[in-house]
Curated annotation (Swiss-Prot):
Swiss-Prot/TrEMBL keywords: Cytoplasm, Endonuclease, Hydrolase, Metal-binding, Nuclease, Ribosome biogenesis, rRNA processing, Zinc
Source organism per UniProt: Shewanella loihica (strain ATCC BAA-1088 / PV-4)
Protein name: Endoribonuclease YbeY
Gene Ontology terms: cellular component: cytoplasm
EC top class, as a word: hydrolase
Record's cofactor remark: Binds 1 zinc ion.
Sites where the protein binds Zn(2+): H118, H122, H128
Family note: Belongs to the endoribonuclease YbeY family.
rRNA processing found in the keyword field: yes
Location(s), subcellular: Cytoplasm
GO terms assigned for molecular function: metalloendopeptidase activity; RNA endonuclease activity; zinc ion binding
EC number of the protein: 3.1.-.-
Length: 157
């Protein structure tokens, strides 16, 4: 499921929290490219890595849930006549990702890859509110994550 030709990607990686072990800019870019596949010839997006307080505040403001969450996606919606390659923003909570990886028995790298792919699919319009859409999204996520050599992210370890 790798793109035939690499997309022109501008990724603004913002690290707004302290962490001992984060993926590299190159890893984030490779996971974004994988998720975008051949959908867009070029894309601009931001990935912001945050602490629990910022995640909780954003989750409360935009989703009405007063707790931190692993990944929030904010798609960029431009008027139809404006052709910009702006995909949107992902906000990923570092402590939540680290805790989930440990609890679920996954490697931290595999879980980071999953969160980036999951968030990018949301930016592309995929959702998991309706069961049929959730199945389609999870199937695509699983294919992409397994193509990296990681196990199915939804399978119990």
């Amino acid at each position: 499921m790798m793109p035939d030709s690499p997309i022109a990607l501008h990724l603004d990686l913002q690290v707004a929290t302290q962490a001992e072990q984060l993926p590299s800019q190159e890893e984030f870019e490779s996971w974004v490219r994988l998720a975008l596949g051949n959908v867009m010839p070029e894309a601009e997006m931001t990935i912001r890595l945050v602490d629990e307080a910022e995640s909780q505040q954003l989750n409360h403001t935009y989703r009405g849930k007063d707790k931190p969450t692993n990944v929030l996606s904010f798609p960029f919606e431009s008027p139809p006549e404006v052709e910009l390659p702006l995909l949107g923003d992902l906000v990923i909570c570092v402590p939540v990702v680290e805790q989930e990886a440990e609890i679920q028995g996954k490697s931290l790298t595999a879980h980071w890859a999953h969160m980036v792919v999951h968030g990018c699919l949301h930016l592309l319009g995929y959702d998991h509110i309706i069961d049929s859409e959730a199945e389609e999204m999870e199937s695509l996520e699983t294919q992409l994550i397994e193509s990296l050599g990681f196990p199915n992210p939804y399978k119990e370890q």
